[in-house]
């Protein structure tokens, strides 16, 4: 019985600590997660938006527009 009470109190204490630290860390993140297109462009060599491209080569950081044969621009 005593062991059960100790375990319950420990779990409640740890949960409270996590909630307190989660509240403190709001809006203090220095390096926000990058968008997946930005990650892709940073990890691979690809052509920037507006460059000439080939739809079959997949050489753009974004996508290749087939009728203009240019890499699509980023949208915010």
From Swiss-Prot:
InterPro entries: Conotoxin, Conotoxin_omega-typ_CS
One GO CC annotation: extracellular region
Propeptide: 23-45
Major location (coarse): secreted
Misc. comment: C.moncuri is a vermivorous cone snail.
Domain writeup: The presence of a 'disulfide through disulfide knot' structurally defines this protein as a knottin. The cysteine framework is VI/VII (C-C-CC-C-C).
Family: Belongs to the conotoxin O1 superfamily.
Name assigned to this protein: Omega-conotoxin MoVIA
């Amino acid at each position: 019985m005593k062991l059960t009470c100790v375990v319950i109190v420990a779990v409640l204490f740890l949960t409270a600590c996590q909630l307190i630290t989660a509240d403190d860390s709001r809006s203090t993140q220095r390096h926000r997660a990058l968008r997946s297109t930005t990650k892709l462009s940073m990890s691979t060599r690809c052509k920037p938006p507006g460059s000439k491209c080939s739809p079959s080569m997949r050489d753009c950081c974004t996508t290749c527009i087939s009728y203009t044969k240019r890499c699509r621009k980023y949208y915010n």
